[in-house]
Amino acid sequence: MANNMREIKSRIKSINQMRQITKAMKLISASKLKKARAQLEETLPYYNKVKETIADILAHSAEVESRFFDIREEKEGKKKAYIVMAGDKGLAGGYNSNIFKLTEHEIGDNKENALLLVAGTTGRSYFSRKEYHVHTEFDYAVQNPTVFRAREITEIILDLYNKQEVDEVYIVYTQMISAISLEPRILKLLPIEISALREDVKADEIVLDQRLKYEPSVTEVLNVLIPKYIKGIMYGTFVEAFTSEQNARMTAMDNATKNADEMLQKLNLYYNRARQATITQEISEIVGGASALE
């Protein structure tokens, strides 16, 4: 009985220590999530204005030619680049595994024509182990999303696209629909679909003058604006992925803390019962010994 009590007491101590860790991780994730959301809200107006300007040009220009709108002719074996935004750490429920599943499903049997740019050490390890072509790795990019890092990745993919080393570029990330709903998504980045961009910016949001002239030409202006637009999407999805990961980890740690509380409640009950049984046994032995002396 005494050995059993010592074992229960040891388990209570271990679970208490684990509970302190999970509770601390939950609080850290909540703080990071709040900071990232504020960071995104500060930068969104600028990138929204860039998007509106591009939509205005498309709305008021007869024909627009740009390599970024170049829908390259259909062919077998199209080279596709995937920017995969995974986490640098685990303990976030199904956050990372859902991203991996979506990426593999999207690539399908076209593995030899898929080129990956992976943000996050978990993604790098997973896809390298599966023998995918990992072109570039970005450690701690999602953990610390910055405009500088978004520009760095944008320059790499634009270089690949302009050299026609890839025909299409996609971003795979997790969108936070709500505090309790996360959805892995895939977004086509290049080439830009003009119809989708026009639909994305409603007509009443375009406030620029129709008679506005762009110098030296519409094409040249677009070639300057579109990389900024892509960088904005890149940064926005980085922050979205970061907030989703923190939310997933916060939820996972909250559930772990609750499970620890339930286990502690049961173990304390077992410990008290064992202690009560020990005391009862000791009393019985004392009473039995006293009776034997009479």
Swiss-Prot record:
It holds the Pfam family ATP-synt. Signal peptide: none annotated. It is found in: Cell membrane. Keywords: ATP synthesis, Cell membrane, CF(1), Hydrogen ion transport, Ion transport, Membrane, Transport. It comes from the Bacteria. PROSITE patterns: ATPASE_GAMMA. Transmembrane segments: none annotated. The keyword Nucleotide-binding does not apply. Its main location: membrane. One of its GO terms (cellular component) is proton-transporting ATP synthase complex. GO terms for molecular function: ATP binding; proton-transporting ATP synthase activity, rotational mechanism. It is a peripheral membrane protein. GO terms for biological process: proton motive force-driven plasma membrane ATP synthesis. Produces ATP from ADP in the presence of a proton gradient across the membrane. The gamma chain is believed to be important in regulating ATPase activity and the flow of protons through the CF(0) complex. PANTHER family: ATP SYNTHASE GAMMA CHAIN, ATP SYNTHASE SUBUNIT GAMMA, MITOCHONDRIAL. F-type ATPases have 2 components, CF(1) - the catalytic core - and CF(0) - the membrane proton channel. CF(1) has five subunits: alpha(3), beta(3), gamma(1), delta(1), epsilon(1). CF(0) has three main subunits: a, b and c. Belongs to the ATPase gamma chain family. This is ATP synthase gamma chain. It comes from Ruminiclostridium cellulolyticum (strain ATCC 35319 / DSM 5812 / JCM 6584 / H10). The lineage of its organism: Bacteria, Bacillati, Bacillota, Clostridia, Eubacteriales. The gene is atpG.
